[in-house]
Design a protein with these regions (language model features):
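Glycine-rich beta-strand-to-loop/alpha-helix junction loops that act as flexible
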Residues: 9, 63-65, 85-87
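ATP/NTP phosphate-donor binding region
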Residues: 1-60, 70, 74
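Short, well-ordered alpha-helical microsegments
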Residues: 43-44, 68-70, 136, 278
Length: 292
């Protein structure tokens, strides 16, 4: 059996190469083909190279962070299953899916044991965790631009990046409006501080976005917080951190299977830790199969 390993060697604390060596040592019967990303957004190029040789009897294993996986799945054919093991700094998809042991993933891959999950599909690509606008997108933007994340990852404190950038974003946020259509129902939401469309339970390095949000179900979970004075914004975020979602009057929640968003102007957003921008976007549920 051939196993194509697509790995991001720079994700998180740079452990991908070590895991590849462990796999080669533990599973000598497998023909391991290694493809390493060479820079930002190189996943599509590596997928294209893999697909030139890939057959239905082969397997794909992705090693990297949430962004590596979502960009790989954007290029990976829907009908082909995949396996995943986290080597990033946030690893929210792995936490939500309870992916912790590499040997369990490898056994599922070898035995062709797979499960159906749903990801979010959009013109900007596949989303495995959340699409965020407002506060959380600003946090990721600050973390990316500052270079602080790379420094802290080297000393295994990558998650601290988000806390420091969150404080900065709290003090310099921009409220926004959006027109929203959920399963054909349209409304305008004004003066937003935080807006997220979730496919999974966690985002932002382990913060629960919504308790029932799961990739195993065909559902989008929309979570948003309206703008308010600083003290109220802090309380709303604390409601998220301390899992008071249902009790909080500050956190709003809507579900659906198809969401269309229109913004008054081009706005920055983050998809699984990667930055983008748009003023119009449609998101739907897409079925995939994962070895687990």
């Amino acid at each position: 059996m051939r196993v194509f390993v697509l790995a991001n060697p720079k994700a998180g604390s740079h452990q991908a190469r070590k895991y590849i060596q462990d796999i080669q040592k533990t599973y000598p019967q497998l023909d391991i083909k290694v493809y390493l990303t060479q820079g930002p957004d190189d996943e599509k190029n590596q997928v294209a190279a893999i697909l030139k040789e890939f057959t239905l009897q082969d397997r794909l294993l992705v090693l990297g962070g949430d962004g590596t996986l979502s960009k790989t799945l954007t290029a990976w054919p829907v009908q082909y299953p995949f396996a995943y093991f986290p080597t990033g700094s946030g690893n929210d998809f792995a936490k939500s899916m309870d992916i912790h042991q590499l040997d369990q993933i490898m056994e599922a891959l070898v035995r062709d044991k797979k499960e159906s999950i749903f990801v979010l599909h959009s013109s900007l690509g596949v989303i495995i965790n959340t699409l965020d606008m407002g506060f959380s997108a600003q946090v990721i933007s600050h973390a990316t631009d500052s270079g602080l994340k790379d420094v802290l990852n080297k000393i295994k404190l990558g998650k601290l990046t988000y806390l420091l950038c969150a404080i900065r974003s709290l003090l310099s946020h921009q409220a926004f409006n959006l027109s929203l259509e959920v399963d054909g129902r349209r409304e305008t939401i004004r003066n937003l501080f935080f807006f997220s469309i979730a496919n999974n339970t966690y985002f932002g390095g382990g913060i629960m976005i919504w308790p029932e949000a799961q990739a195993s179900q065909r559902q989008l979970d929309l979570v948003y917080i309206e703008d308010a004075p600083l003290s109220q914004r802090i309380l709303a975020l604390l409601d998220l951190v301390f899992k008071r979602h249902r009790q909080s009057h500050r956190i709003k929640h809507v579900t659906g299977e198809r969401v269309a968003i229109d913004l008054e102007e081009t706005f920055i957003l983050q998809l699984d830790g990667e930055m983008s921008s748009t003023n119009s976007l449609t998101i739907t549920c897409q079925e995939r199969f994962i070895y687990q």
